[in-house]
Amino acid sequence: MNVQIGIDLMGGDHSPLVIWEVLIDVLNSRASNSHISFTAFASHEVKEQILSHSTYKGYPEVIASESFITMEDSPLSAIRKKSSSMALGLDYLKEDKIDALISTGNTAALITLSRTKIPMFPTVRRPALLVRVPTMRGCAVILDVGANVSVNPEEMLGFARMGLAYKQCLGDTEHPTVGLLNIGSEERKGTEAHRLTFRLLRETFQHAFLGNIESGDVFSGSVDVVVSDGFTGNIFLKTAEGVFDFLSHILGDKLESDVKRQLDYTIYPGSMVCGLSKLVIKCHGKACGRSLFNGISGSIDLVRARVCERILSSLS
């Protein structure tokens, strides 16, 4: 299967040349596979820097943009930058010139532009950011982790459907379960929206819904899919990442390699903008080389798994 991956080099916390070098590392690691190719999107200046210094002159292809989106740009200003590197990448995705787009840039801008350019699944009201996190039993899927600050119960139900479909695509469990991230396990816990969502999930999924789950229990692997609003989910995710980084720094070499590998969230691809008919991956703006490497490599695997088509099929 031929796979064409697009990557926006602009707008992240790292230099575009750092992202480019990671892209070259991925190419080198898959040198024997001629069915994988990349298209990068960058400013004219960055393209010139790449062409003047890279040993891969002209390959991967670099598409020059008139502008790029910064972390300070609002969604509205991002829309106005019609020739930004991010917008060009999404245009290529819309026109099937690439199979997936990866960005380390402005999350709100990426989601807004994606919604304006890429069709959503017919039954989904809002996209959600979906990530995988390590657990004692493998990995769990959690969504939303930042696309929507507030959502209603019907939208949370849509997140649960997409999360279950995604988990089934991974092939590590035949009958995935779902839980609702909340401040307690009891049914009455949380806001009115949480209580309504609890009842809706129970009515819809019955035995597959295991009730509320507290943040500390996510890593036990007691549920396969964790549903959350984007505000709570984002705080959970960044806290978890911070704890891992803290432990890695404090314990250093004392942390056994197999334990470190089990805790390491960077082995998984970045956040998938779930709900779109095409694959868009958001890597953390501060992502290190390894995290970016795995985000790019993971996107190749998701394309080959036809994850968007399979989620759509499950929602039909």
UniProtKB/Swiss-Prot annotation:
Family according to the record: Belongs to the PlsX family.
Function (record text): Catalyzes the reversible formation of acyl-phosphate (acyl-PO(4)) from acyl-[acyl-carrier-protein] (acyl-ACP). This enzyme utilizes acyl-ACP as fatty acyl donor, but not acyl-CoA.
Quaternary structure annotation from Swiss-Prot or TrEMBL: Homodimer. Probably interacts with PlsY.
One MF annotation (Gene Ontology) recorded for this entry: phosphate:acyl-[acyl carrier protein] acyltransferase activity
UniProt keywords, alphabetically: Cytoplasm, Lipid biosynthesis, Lipid metabolism, Phospholipid biosynthesis, Phospholipid metabolism, Transferase
Transmembrane segments: none
NCBIfam families: plsX, PRK13846.1
GO biological process, one term: phospholipid biosynthetic process
Keyword Lipid metabolism: yes
Reaction catalysed by this enzyme: a fatty acyl-[ACP] + phosphate = an acyl phosphate + holo-[ACP]
Compartments it resides in: Cytoplasm
Predominant location: cytoplasm
Pathway the protein acts in: Lipid metabolism; phospholipid metabolism
Protein name: Phosphate acyltransferase
Enzyme Commission (EC) number: 2.3.1.274
